[in-house]
Amino acid sequence: MIYEEILRELAYMRIYLGKNIGKVSRKEIYKLYRRYLKLYMLLPIKNPKFDKNNPLYFNGNCYCYALMLPTPKEFYDAYMNACDDVDLPLSFHHDVGFISEKKCFLKPSKLLDNLKSDLDSLGIYYYETDIDSINNHGGYKISLYYNYGEDFHFIREDSDGKWSHKMGYSGSIERVEPSERIFKYNLVTTYEIVKPNIRKLLRWAKVNC
């Protein structure tokens, strides 16, 4: 798909949901949202910069923030006013695995499997690395943390080399020092992730330089 076609389809999904508040099921909204994110990944988006007031993350959690995933207001409002689906949460959740339609289990091995599956679904390449290592593939780093049996957390490296995170859905965006333990969370792994457009830019640079 070309850039203009992607923008048109993204806009259509938002308009469709905005015009059909209360008429769309939660299951259909999640299906549209997954499609939205996969298309969004094809846009010319650079590696992240720190901006504590970025509206892109207003309806998202730490996972959305780490992967730079938007949650447009139309999706959020449609979900909160959707036709009832008893097998889905009442609030719009972004658990690890939701993009690849996998159930989230709060075990490190399951979280890792789900994370890899989500990244694969979005066309994002990932390379295991360390917090202090340089990025060898043109991407940026994310780190997964885990509080045993209770919760997960993500932080990300911004383009200035510093790290930041968002604590849950209502938390603010803040700087954070990466370490083996953050608050009550223990480090599970760190990946350098490379999105489709970054790979495209790197290929172009390699050919033209």
Where are these regions (language model features)?
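N-terminal intrinsically disordered, low-complexity, charge/repeat-rich segments that act as generic
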Residues: 30-57
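...with weaker cross-activation on analogous glycine-rich loops/strands in unrelated enzymes
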Residues: 95-170
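Short amphipathic alpha-helical heptad-repeat segments
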Residues: 2-13, 32
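Active-site nucleophilic cysteine motif
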Residues: 54-72, 104-112, 151
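Active-site or metal-binding loop neighborhoods of secreted/extracellular toxin and effector enzymes
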Residues: 161-209
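Charged, low-complexity interaction regions
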Residues: 15-28
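Extracellular glycan-recognition/adhesion modules and their associated mucin-like linkers
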Residues: 50, 55-59, 142-148
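Surface-exposed patches in mature extracellular/periplasmic domains of secreted proteins
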Residues: 74-85, 89-92, 128-132
